[in-house]
Curated annotation (Swiss-Prot):
Residues 1-117 form a transit peptide. GO terms for biological process: mitochondrial mRNA modification. Keywords: Mitochondrion, Transit peptide. This is Mitochondrial 3' processome subunit 1. Residues 45-71, 88-156, 829-863 are annotated as: Disordered. As part of the mitochondrial 3' processome (MPsome), involved in the maturation of guided RNA (gRNA) precursors. Component of the mitochondrial 3' processome (MPsome) complex composed at least of terminal uridylyltransferase KRET1/TUT1, 3'-5' exonuclease DSS1, MPSS1, MPSS2 and MPSS3. Within the complex, interacts with KRET1. GO terms for cellular component: mitochondrion; protein-containing complex. It is found in: Mitochondrion. The keyword Amino-acid biosynthesis does not apply. CDD domains: MPSS1_C (cd23670). Disruption phenotype: RNAi-mediated knockdown at the procyclic stage causes moderate growth defect and reduces production of guided RNAs (gRNA) due to a block in the processing of gRNA precursors.
Length: 1728
């Protein structure tokens, strides 16, 4: 019913409104605002909202760390007011309010109705029916008149209409002030409204200036100038005055004086007193208990002395709850106070105080003249500039003087700020005019509002108290109220937490902590904080604060006391700057005032108040609401921030006399014990942070995922700083405090003695966390993630932290895990045994489990997985850290070793806890990391003990140190090739040599000679500097080598040109992201030398200078330097013969031997030197690898360099040089092999790979840095070349060394191959084909034979090899094991879509060799023939590598048919083929023809069997005397014909073997009866018969007998030459000399090969000749003569015995041949 009547009333009221009002009504209604609500409805609504005031509408944003002091929370009431007036102008706002009839004639009513305040119109209007307070007209008022006045006021009711109107409009006026660009008219209107409200209350009075003389009255200001001003008509306006002896200024505002004792005795939670155990914290149940034991207090009276106020209280009550303590603030108000309390709520005064505080800052800024030329900022900066000038002049400024000057300036600045509770003194202006003291209307109203709020302290809500306390921290009062206000707020908040019906949320906690931390605002002496820097130092043109050197000199703290800006205390309530000048960086007036008002005493008080609150708080009181992530995290960050700031601010420790609030209380045992416990707990730094984790540990796991990453990082860093780092220092046995660099500031560590080192500071935390499994898992998860991020960040190279900081962080992470595991183990022990007990070592040893190679306790599955993950991350972090250490960082490595593996605790207490933590520490720290640390320390010691020659040049000294560290095995960053060239070019120019780089092509030869002449007369590098320069260049070039095929083939100038071309391409595209390592390396150096167009020519000149220096000093340089120069192609390889020539003669043999021994030691100890030697051997001594020029079998020096081939030498000179170079190369190979065999055990070898102890799948390995990739590549190349060296040495010495020595070398080779396989990438260029070739070639040389059933079948699933080589008993099984390991790499490369011809050929050759060793090969599934066909499709590739292709076609039976696709190419390119390639083509064609013939025969036999024609199947195969019909493809016959003509055309130059291969190939393709065959045969018989040996005749006899048409003619033609050959054999055998044997054996065969040839010759003769007894007798004589010659040429009895055994074979062959010819009487000759 009431709602209906109200709605009707609203409709009627709407119809009678004027058009303007109707428009406003529609406007507001369209914006969701009701304008027709009656006044009483608004008042009820406001009262209801006041009761709900305790709950703010919006949460604190994630980035909000605190707001400015004028209201940090938007309440529901403010939201309603602001929403109703957000679209209104000031005029509309004032016109909108209705004009109640009862207030129509009042001043406020006139102001509202006319949209103007009353002082602009009728100044004589006073409230009707209300008589203003009487004014004193003469003299000072007497006591009787005052009492009469108070009596009169008490008898009448003071109206509050103006005050209520002010309550309604103050928030809107503040909004309008900001919306209108800080309009001064709004400020003046607000001041007038305040004055009128005070006038209505009787606090102020009005008078005419022309009235009687005022005595004792104080003028009240409304704006910057006084109110009295002339109006337009010349009349004077009345002014507001404050009567003398006003109760507002009779006493200053003070808080009731309480002590910490009061707080402790009135906030003890029920049931949390000391137990029967005497208050042992370890036995206290932390759920619902305080961190420290506190006893129960009995009721007793006490007196708090302070400011003359005596208050009685007991333990059940609170001094703050008594009205007497607070009523003293409004003493003398009388009936006015009662009237205000009854008719105005405390919420209205609190909200009004917020607006008053806001406008007070505004008017004070104008009154002080902030931003003018005489601003106090100028004085501050002048003082700092004077200190800076003093420091720059060389003399240190007096710190105390500078500090005193800053304090004096700050004090004078604070005196200019008007106080709220007292009247300022008279002010003397510049002109000598003395102005009477005055007070501003805003100050008076703020005084009244604060007194009314404080007098009703117990009635205010939580957030209202926060705001009032905030105002009390500003410099607005006669006395500093900050500490007293904070203490009162702490006690009130603790009591609200302890009440059973209290509705306290985490939001309340956050606002309390933020308000208390407001006391910790930086003072003027904290010159390293952001607000103080902004105040003291100007801004540079770039907009950043000038870094003054005087900053360190003038600070009253220590030089390293820097505020951690990452955790944001200095910016918690930082306001934005209000104005900015071009010449100065002007801070806000509010910031400057707070900085000037700050003090170290307040900072200590903030710390102690938070410590008191965290100590007394009941954790269960924080759990009455759901945890809010933002508020909880913001609370923790604020506590952590204060703890960090105060701990670093007062680093000298807090003795008993230095505590501000926490003093032991005499007579109160309970409070004294509690305070003493807190003080002892704070002896270890960061106690406040530990208390935060004690109270909030159960909340953090639930909010952790919902807060920002930055907040998580701050909280986790605080845990490591407050818990982990003190634990590290305690267990490590540090004798004195350690300081670590914490984000640019020094933090104080534990400073207790060894004898007093205990873990008491961790007891509360251990007790709290024992039952919280979620928080322990959170700690372990954070540690695991931190370790992973550390490994990535260290490996990325982008970190800027010092190594000591990384070491401290790593220790903190690991010790956090050990601490969490200790708490978890303690909880499990309590659950099993009902209480903590010492672990039983006997039982534990029986319940051990292996976790990642470590013996750990019988842990749950989840714990084992956590420890395994942590072990992997710890390995990766240690590896990354070791890679960053240099030789001078030995202390860091020793510190890591000391922290993790050698902890020492010298205290006698808590031995059980310490041992348990150390045991869990060893579960995370594995033995591999310990071995790596020890190895690194040994390498560092080796590097420091290395003898070096002192150099004068700084750059060369740096390179020398880097080289020494690299040779010692330390992971260092070597200079790149670009950096080396840049440094050397600059050094050469510095020493007077001009490198212009502007030569023309036609002048290069002349200038090269000039450079050589200059280098011969002027020395650029000394003999001590040249080895350093050459080795740095050599290392840089090897670093850029990626595959085996590119080692040693590129000059320095060519590499620089490659870099230039790649950089130019990237620069043209404008994109450097895809340039790879080359582009990044060039762009990182940022050198003009390389980026210029003449960089390549400058590098060529540099090469010429270095070549000349090496030529001059070759005899004085170490041999390894000469080898490095050869590797760099600075000098030719022939220079090594000079080294041998200089030592010719008996007197120098000892010196030469010493040189070789020194070189061998270098190969043993230094990887780079070994790599250089192996590179040269690989390039100059090919081993068992087919190439384009022929088959290299490693029998001598094979490959001269390109420049050597261009030189023209005589034949004798070439032979002599080749012999000398071959001798040096073989000696070098022998030295390398000996160094490899005599080296230490591989496990003791120190290389940079030893330090990579992390897992193979960790983040650092998945994303390796360029330095790690280069080092891993060099390590792999070193292993590959070592395998090649051993294989070459085995092949070279297989016939000369003893068998057991060869087997030892082969066993070493197998172990090296096993080591290199894990480093082989599954990518092109992995050199697995070379490994297979070298392995198989060594096996052939050793004489290895496989078991008959050994099968190699590809493709196949790789078998998992069991064990290692040590488990294989024989060399055969070890070889099979290695072959199984190589197979996956070979198959994956063969299955790639792109065919690599050289790789395929190497694999085919190796497989053919395995067939010779007895293995069965089945590679049909890989279609090797198709790979060769695909390769032959590229004609250019086929032309370059035709020899390799022919070798591949000849390797296996399955690939022999591939020659058909190249037959046409052989015909077309016959004139471009060399004789060796023609010979290889004849062999390939013959093998292919034989394969087709066998396939044809098998097909014919299969057809005959299918037709069941058994009789014909017998005649398919030809007998010894009947030639078989050869069926071969026509392509092969045409290819043979073309190549045969090519041989005949160059018959004079063609070797004899080439003719023999042509005849053999003709027989294979079925062209025996051709004219070309007869021409070839006749040329050989007629002109080359002296060069034919016995095996050549065997081949001729076998081919001729296959002729069908010309067999008889050929038989007749060959009879005479054959008899002549047998006569020659007989004559040479009769001489019985070695020369005759060698004459017959033109191919230099051994004796056994010659005897085998005799048997074959005898068996081949009856295939063509039947002959007579004369022929067979001649044959018998020839055989006997040759056998006798071989027997007589034998050098020992063993050879004679082997030759004697061949006699039976020769007899058997001769008897079989005679029987086959039909001469049975000759089958058993008696001549022998």
């Amino acid at each position: 019913m009431r709602r209906l009547i109200l709605s009707q009333t609203l409709r009627v009221a709407g119809r009678h409104r004027p058009p303007v009002a109707m428009f406003l009504q529609r406007f507001y209604r369209g914006h969701g605002i009701s304008t027709a609500l009656p006044l009483h409805y608004s008042k009820r609504h406001r009262k209801r909202e006041g009761r709900m005031y305790g709950k703010p509408l919006r949460p604190v944003s994630d980035g909000e760390n605190g707001a400015s002091g004028d209201g940090g929370v938007l309440t529901r009431w403010e939201a309603v007011v602001s929403s109703r007036h957000q679209c209104e102008s000031p005029v509309q706002t004032l016109a909108k309010s209705e004009k109640p009839k009862k207030a129509e004639n009042t001043v406020a009513g006139k102001m509202t109705g006319s949209s103007r305040f009353s002082h602009r119109r009728d100044h004589s209007a006073y409230p009707s029916g209300v008589q203003p307070a009487p004014l004193a007209t003469s003299g000072l008022p007497t006591q009787s008149s005052e009492r009469q006045q108070q009596k009169q006021i008490g008898q009448q009711q003071v109206p509050l209409d103006a005050l209520h109107r002010l309550f309604k409009v103050h928030a809107v006026m503040r909004t309008n002030y900001e919306a209108l660009g800080k309009c001064t008219k709004v400020l003046k209107s607000f001041s007038t409204a305040c004055a009128e409200a005070l006038l209505q209350l009787g606090v102020l009075q009005k008078e005419q200036p022309s009235a009687m003389e005022r005595k004792g009255f104080i003028d009240v200001q409304l704006c910057k100038s006084r109110v009295t001003e002339a109006s337009k008509n010349g009349t004077s306006s009345p002014c507001f005055v404050l009567p003398p002896e006003s109760p507002l200024y009779r006493t200053t505002i003070k808080f009731p004086t309480i002590t910490v004792e009061h707080v402790l005795t009135t906030t003890v939670p029920a049931g949390c007193g000391a137990k029967d155990s005497g208050g042992d914290i370890m036995s206290v149940d932390m759920e619902g208990a305080a961190p420290f034991p506190m006893g129960h207090c009995e009721s007793r009276p006490s007196t708090s002395a302070g400011n003359g106020v005596t208050v009685e209280y007991d333990c059940e009550g609170d001094v703050l709850s008594h009205g007497a303590a607070w009523n003293s603030i409004i003493e003398g108000f009388g009936q006015l106070a009662l009237n205000l309390k009854q008719n105005a709520s405390v919420s209205d005064f609190a909200q009004l105080a917020e607006t008053l505080a806001y406008f007070k800052w505004v008017k004070d800024e104008e009154q002080v003249g902030w931003g003018t030329e005489d601003c106090v900022v100028k004085k501050f900066r002048e003082a700092m500039a004077n200190a800076k000038d003093t420091s720059a002049s060389g003399s240190d400024p007096n710190t105390s003087d500078v500090s005193a000057a800053l304090a004096a300036i700050a004090e004078s600045f604070l005196r200019k700020i008007p106080r709220v509770d007292c009247i300022g003194s008279a002010v003397v202006h510049r002109g000598g005019e003395r102005t009477a003291p005055s007070v501003h209307a805003i100050d008076v109203m703020l005084n009244l509002a604060l007194r009314m709020c404080l007098s009703q302290w117990h009635a205010m809500s939580h957030f209202e108290r926060m705001n009032i306390v905030l105002f009390c921290t500003y410099p607005w009062f006669a006395e500093d109220l900050s500490i007293a206000a904070g203490l009162c707020l702490t006690q009130s908040y603790l009591q609200s937490l302890l009440r059973a019906d209290a509705d306290v949320t985490y939001q309340h906690t956050f606002h309390y902590v933020r308000r208390v931390s407001r006391l910790c605002w930086p003072c003027i002496h904290d010159t390293d904080s952001a607000p103080v820097k902004k105040l003291l130092f100007p801004r540079d043109p770039q907009g950043t604060a000038v870094s003054s050197h005087a900053l360190e000199a003038v600070s009253v703290e220590e030089k390293d006391n820097q505020l951690n800006q990452k955790e944001g205390l200095q910016g918690e309530e930082q306001a934005t700057t209000t104005s900015e000048s071009k010449l100065m960086w002007l801070p806000s007036f509010k910031d400057a005032s707070c900085v000037s008002y700050g003090s170290s005493m307040k900072q200590r008080a903030a710390y102690e108040l938070l410590l008191l609150w965290m100590t007394c708080v009941n954790p269960s009181g924080l759990h009455r609401s759901s945890p809010h992530g933002r508020y909880v995290s913001a609370t923790g960050i604020a506590i952590i921030d204060v703890d960090l700031f105060v701990t670093q601010r007062f680093r000298t420790g807090k003795s008993k006399d230095e505590w501000l609030l926490l003093h032991p209380v005499e007579g109160d045992v309970v409070a004294s014990v509690t305070i003493r416990t807190m003080v002892q707990h704070c002896e270890t730094p960061y106690a406040l942070t530990r208390l935060f984790f004690c109270n909030f540990h159960s909340v953090l796991p639930h909010i952790w995922g919902g807060i920002g990453a930055r907040r998580r990082e701050i909280i986790w860093t605080a845990w490591c700083r407050a818990v982990a780092q003190p634990l590290v220092n305690t267990l490590s046995g540090s004798d004195e405090g350690q300081r670590e660099d914490d984000g640019g500031m020094q933090t104080l560590q534990i400073t207790v003695d060894n004898a007093d080192r205990t873990l008491d500071y961790l007891k509360p935390l251990i007790s709290a966390l024992t039952s919280d499994e979620l928080f322990l898992r959170l700690i372990m998860r954070c540690a695991d993630k931190s370790l992973e991020e550390m490994a990535c960040e260290i490996g990325s190279g982008n970190n800027t932290l010092p190594l000591s900081k990384w070491c401290a962080q790593l220790a903190g992470f690991v010790y956090s895990v050990a601490f969490a595991l200790h708490c978890r183990a303690k909880r499990e022990g309590c659950n099993r045994d009902g209480g903590p007990s010492r672990p039983n070592t006997a039982t534990d040893s029986a319940n051990k489990k292996v976790v990642s190679g470590k013996q750990t306790d019988n842990l749950p599955k989840g714990t084992q997985e956590d420890i395994s993950d942590l072990q992997l991350q710890f390995k990766a972090a240690v590896s990354a850290l070791l890679r960053k250490l240099s030789a001078g960082d030995t202390q860091v490595a020793e510190q890591l070793l000391h922290h993790f593996y050698e902890p020492h605790f010298s205290g006698d207490q808590e031995r059980e806890v310490v041992e348990d933590i150390q045991r869990h520490l060893q579960q995370v720290c594995d033995s591999q990391s310990r071995d790596a640390l020890h190895a690194w320390i040994e390498c560092s010691a080796r590097a420091s003990c290395e003898a070096t020659v002192p150099l004068k040049e700084e750059l060369l000294c740096k390179w020398q140190r880097t080289v020494l560290e690299a040779d010692a095995g330390l992971p260092v960053v070597l200079p790149t090739i670009v950096e080396c060239c840049r440094g050397l070019v600059g050094l050469v120019k510095k020493r007077g040599r001009n490198i212009s780089g502007r030569r023309q092509g036609q002048q290069r030869g002349t200038e090269s000679t000039t450079v050589g002449e200059e280098s011969s007369c002027k020395e650029v590098f000394s003999k001590e500097e040249l080895p350093v320069v050459i080795t740095v260049l050599s290392r840089a070039m090897l670093t850029r080598t990626s595959t085996v095929s590119t080692v040693g083939l590129t000059k320095i100038s060519s590499e620089i040109s490659t870099l230039l071309s790649s950089c130019g391409y990237e620069t043209a595209d404008g994109n450097t992201s895809g340039g790879g390592r080359n582009g990044r390396e060039l762009c990182d150096t940022n050198t003009a030398t390389i980026t210029s167009a003449t960089a390549g020519e400058r590098t060529v000149e540099l090469e010429l200078i270095l070549s000349g220096e090496i030529d001059q000093k070759a005899g004085e340089l170490p041999w390894i330097t000469i080898l490095e120069a050869v590797q760099l192609q600075l000098v030719p390889y022939t220079v090594v013969k000079n080294l041998l020539t200089s030592f010719k003669g008996g007197c120098d043999n000892g010196k030469e031997r010493l040189r070789w021994q020194e070189l061998q030691r270098d190969f043993q100890r230094k990887r780079h030197h070994r790599l250089v030697g192996n590179t040269l051997v690989f390039r100059w001594y090919g081993c068992a690898v087919p190439n384009d020029e022929g088959w290299e079998d490693g029998s001598g020096l094979m490959r001269p360099m390109a420049e050597d081939r261009d030189n023209v030498h005589s034949a004798s000179h070439q032979g002599r040089t080749s012999t000398e170079l071959g001798a040096f190369t073989r000696r070098l190979l022998k030295t390398l092999a000996r160094a490899e065999v005599t080296r230490l055990d591989d496990r003791k070898e120190i290389t940079t790979q030893t330090f990579v102890v992390g897992p193979s799948d960790d983040s650092a390995t998945r994303h390796p840095t360029p330095g790690q990739e280069e080092d891993a590549n060099l390590q792999r190349l070193d292993l590959l070349f070592r395998v090649h060296t051993l294989a070459a040495h085995i092949l070279m010495t297989a016939s000369t060394k003893k068998p057991h020595m060869i087997h030892e070398l082969y066993d070493t080779l197998l172990h090296l191959v096993e080591r290199v396989m894990p480093t082989t990438p599954n990518a092109p260029g992995n050199a697995s084909d070379l490994l297979l070739l070298w392995l198989v070639g060594s096996a052939v040389a050793v004489g290895l034979r496989f078991r008959p059933n050994f099968l190699i079948k590809w493709p196949s699933t790789p078998e998992v090899s069991s064990g290692n080589l040590k488990s294989c008993p024989s060399a055969e099984e070890k070889t099979v094991h290695i072959l199984r390991d190589i197979e996956p790499y070979l198959q994956s490369e063969l299955l790639r879509p792109t065919v690599r011809l050289r790789f395929v050929i190497n694999v085919l050759v190796a497989l053919r060799s395995l067939e010779l060793l007895g293995a069965r090969i089945d590679v049909e599934g890989l279609h090797m023939d198709q790979l060769l066909v695909r390769a032959s499709a590229d004609r250019r590739l086929l032309s370059r590598h035709v020899n390799l292709f022919l070798i591949g076609c000849s390797a296996l039976q399955s690939t022999q048919s591939s020659i058909l696709h190249t037959a046409l190419h052989l015909r077309e390119a016959k004139y471009n083929l060399s004789f060796a390639e023609i010979e290889r083509a004849f062999v390939a064609i013959a093998l292919s023809a034989d394969t087709f013939a066998r396939q044809h025969e098998a097909l014919m036999e299969q057809n005959y069997q299918q037709q069941q024609n058994r009789t014909l199947s017998v005649t398919v195969a030809a007998n010894n005397t009947t030639p078989a019909l050869r069926v071969s493809p026509v392509q092969l016959r045409h290819a043979w014909s073309a190549l045969g003509r090519r041989v005949l055309e160059n018959a004079g130059e063609s070797p004899t073997d080439l003719f023999v291969r042509g005849l053999q190939c003709a027989a294979a393709v079925g062209c025996i009866d051709s004219a070309l065959y007869q021409q070839l045969l006749s040329y050989v018989v007629e002109f080359r018969w002296e060069d034919l040996h016995i095996l050549d005749w065997v081949m001729i006899l076998r081919t001729v007998r296959q002729s069908f048409e010309n067999r008889r003619n050929l038989e007749a033609y060959l009879k005479e030459p054959l008899q002549a050959f047998m006569l020659t054999m007989t004559d040479s055998g009769d001489n019985s000399t070695e020369q005759s044997v060698q004459k017959v054996n033109l191919k230099n065969h051994e004796g056994e090969q010659l005897l085998e040839g005799l048997c074959l010759f005898a068996e081949a003769l009856p295939g063509l000749f039947i002959g007579d007894r004369e022929l067979w007798g001649l044959l018998w004589q020839a055989l006997g003569s040759q056998w006798s010659a071989c027997f007589n040429a034998a050098s020992n009895i063993e050879e004679q015995q082997r030759i004697t055994a061949w006699l039976q074979e020769i007899n058997a062959s001769y008897a079989w041949a005679a029987r086959a010819a039909g001469f049975r009487g000759l089958d058993e000759p008696t001549a022998l």
